[in-house]
Amino acid sequence: DAWGTAFWSEAYRSFDEITLPKTAQMFMNHHQILDYRRFAAGQTNDFLNEQALLIKKFARNQWVTTNYIPNYDEGHIGGSKQLDFQSYTRYMVYGDNEGIGRRGYRVGNPLRIALANDFFRPIQGTYGVMELQPGQVNWGSINPQPLPGAVRLWMWSVFAGGADFLCTYRYRQPLYGTEQYHYGIVGTDGVTVTPGGREYQQFMSEIRNLRTHYAPRDQKPEAYLKRRTAILFNHENSWSIDRQKQNRTWDTWAHIEKYYRTLKSFGAPVDFITEEKDFSQYPVLLVPAYQLADQLLVDRWIDYVKKGGHLIVTCRTAQKDRYGRLPEAPFGSLIDKLTGNEMEFYDLLLPETPGIVRMDDKPYSWNTWGEVLKPGKENRILATYQDEFYEGKPAATFRRLGKGTVTYVGVDTNDGTFEKEILKKLYGEFSIPVMDLPYGVTLEYRNGLGIVLNYSDRPYTFPLPAGAKAVVGEPTIPTAGVFVFTL
């Protein structure tokens, strides 16, 4: 019954008849695949736990972790409780073109390490990087040299996010085997330090010098802490949506990253959290495309808001139960009491003929997903649709509930500009001060230090706070440069 196998006359007489689902088949049972992926993630975690316990049996004083690849939709990440802490692997330059500018492919995606930090740090607090790219690699589609300074930039990015350790793969370039063309800290002679190795040396020297400046207590500016934001994440939502996208242009992670990118431009500390965490420690809680939900979770959201939290919920949230089934109720109605809205319907447009959503008399293009809302009297309309048969109908709303607020954004736009503008509008409403850092520049604080990282293709001049003192670099930061200051 949980899988709805009566649909298309599927029936199982016993568990022995159940086979592994063929996920490549377009119409394979969605609910069965969801449960199978839960099972597979659980088995992976059990196996990691078994290995950890076995190692600890014979090496009781040995720390045990594993080297996760940050594929965030894989359900086993963070689920092995026998690990002492979390670690991940991160490569930045391997032939993609996600950097900024003509040579951005030599530096890498500006938020790739930042997002990994913000994802892994909240799991246990203690975490690090087990593999960080030391230079040129062998396994990409095209394997260019990193830009001089990029390896050091990546190391500083790991440190800035709060990591406790950093390792690389590998020390020496291998003389044989599959990865002969993979750089190490030293070259094939085992003696000559590579360009990346020299940047490791520079970083280690800088960290040693910082020990005379750091604060043992994690001092951070008050304005920075006011911006603290959590993104509620459950990989199962991606599993469910990706089986039934309804629009080929839908991308769950791209939807989340539109908001994440804006938050980092605000200079906001961000945590990706699960439902196990306490929502109340965050002034703002973002809930993007959280499709699988139940009444217990919705009640927690309501409680968070009534006690003073600012909740931002986006499209496709709470439309299915935990099995991926549609409730026998009006579509999407589980959160009606939370948002103060009813949903009339949702629409999906061809990318060749996008629609327009308008906020503060400015137009924004969309096509992937749009919910037409019917707001209650207490709701304020933030954005409306244009140029469709539902022109003038609400796309986003805002309401006050108890001591807090609820914002519902029912549309996913094309380039993220709308998402940025609505967050700017909301943080102003919340009286939370934000920065306006250009894409490619990030700011983090740890141990009484401010750390500014420049992944962009041009120099950036950071306004040094009053009373701050530069300890690494200068306020005008070149491409692949770093600036560190004390508070």
Regions found by a protein language model. Give the residues of each.
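Active-site neighborhood of glycoside hydrolase catalytic domains
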Residues: D1-T66, P70-Q82, F266-G267
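Carbohydrate-binding surfaces of carbohydrate-active enzymes
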Residues: S14-P21, I33, R37-A40, N49, ...
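Glycine-enriched alpha-helix->loop->beta-strand junction motifs that scaffold or abut catalytic
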Residues: Q82-Q86, G162
